[in-house]
Amino acid sequence: MLSQNNNALGIIFPNSYDNTVPELVTERTMASIPFAGRYRMVDFILSSMANCGISNVSIVVRKNYHSLMDHLGTGREWDMARRHGGLNIVPPFAEKGVRIYSGRVEALGSILNFLENQKEKYVVMSDANIAVNYDFNALLAAHQASGADVTIAYQKVEIPEGRKNDNYTLTVDADGRVTELLFNDYRSGKQNLDLNIYVLEREILIKLVKDAAARGLIYFERDILAHNVNILNIRALEYTGYVAHVCDMKSYFDENLKLIDEKNLNALFPKQSPVYTKIRDDNPVRYVTGSRVESSILADGCVIEGTVENSVLFRGVRVKKGAVVKNCVLMQDTVVEPNAELDCVVTDKNVKITAGKKLSGTESFPVYVQKNHIV
């Protein structure tokens, strides 16, 4: 990890976009959804911050955060187990009879005292619905050079039909200034998609949050940024690297399988910027005589006796003799019994597929099996 004093603290919102993947967040947050064989979604943003020398990071949780706390622990894997700063899990603060926050402004309002007591000049904020290896130092440098009040990271991309809900797009002029911020933009063609990564001065953030809270506003993008594009100096920085967006079950399925392509895998996991995660001591993958594996990602602890094709298998998955797994994403400790057949299936943790069972979805509608279920 880089040792660099960039004078910035990080804030991650793990529950943002929980509503887009309800199947996967009944007992967890978006941030703790398993991804890419052995990681969680939060690992990517948190590792990016760690690699850029941001060592004071707060994760502002809302609900279902026990699995996230278990995964992050003290933050040791990210070099954030520190007496001063380090990794902080901030629970929802709500008085009796007061609802827990729903928008980013309310979330920030609940930690205003914390923000006011910090020493860093800048704040970088992010959600956890994207897997990206992001250079926050480049964002900070661009922000400082432009003299902006707020700088937004964006990606120029064509948003598929059916995935345009809960997205913000930007109109950016030739000087990089944001002139318009749109919610649920249904225009066709490539758009400037807001990656929900922001940097601004801590004092400016505190002022914006206080002003918004006084007026009963709750959404950072919609209520603050969009309504103040002509008042605030809002700049945008394009990101041209690899981004995996998780916005529904299909995208979760697709983005995992895309990593089977070595080009995509190397783009998300460059050697110079590693992604850290909770360590689990497992044996290497064991391939039993007669097994067959093609074009797949297999994490440590897997035992393969049958056939696996074009699939992503998380830690501890077992595919027994005669079983066939194709185009699947099987989470931790899934067991596929003898002669079962799976095609276009997503299993959550600790699922058991009984002997001879056949499950088949499609690329557009993969079958999902809930955590701890037996089929």
Segments from the language model and where they lie:
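Unchanged
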Residues: 1-257, 369
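Left-handed beta-helix
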Residues: 1-14, 203, 211-375
